[in-house]
């Protein structure tokens, strides 16, 4: 018998990791990964310069992860910076921040052969290290595997 109050949706980005799952494969900067519906790579990682009113909290900085994605299937695949999560060496997840590096990754859908690119930005501690980017779009009817990139920082 299961307790429905403790079950989490497979689409919940805050759900706990599966302790029996193998460790995620870590793709290096610049390398393409072909998922079932799309291919993706991290082009660059940069410190963001923002307007003073968007400045990070004291002791923090904003970094931008420049993503490039291409649709691989006849069915359009959703693209959105909100599908990205940044993890640091402590395992703490960081959600995207709306004010950061430009141009931002546009939200939308990619048709087969169509490519888009842009930054997804995060606010992290000045001394954050071991940064990993996990990208996992929400696709109706199934849960695509997350793709993890080693950001080399």
PLM regions and their residue ranges:
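Conserved functional micro-motifs across diverse proteins
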Residues: 1-153
């Amino acid at each position: 018998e299961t307790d429905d109050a403790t079950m989490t949706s497979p689409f919940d980005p805050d759900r706990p990791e599966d302790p029996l799952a193998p460790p995620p494969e870590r793709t290096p900067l610049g390398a393409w990964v072909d998922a079932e519906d799309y291919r993706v790579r991290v082009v660059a990682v940069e410190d963001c310069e923002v307007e003073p009113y968007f400045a990070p909290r004291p002791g923090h900085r904003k970094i931008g992860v420049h993503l490039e994605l291409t649709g691989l299937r006849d069915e359009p695949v959703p693209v959105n910076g909100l599908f990205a999560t940044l993890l640091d060496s402590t395992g703490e997840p960081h959600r995207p921040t709306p004010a950061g590096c430009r141009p931002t990754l546009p939200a939308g859908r990619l048709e087969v052969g169509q490519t888009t690119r842009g930054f997804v930005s995060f606010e992290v501690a000045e001394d954050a290290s071991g940064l990993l980017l996990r990208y996992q779009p929400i696709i109706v009817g199934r849960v695509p595997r997350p793709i993890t990139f080693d950001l080399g920082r």
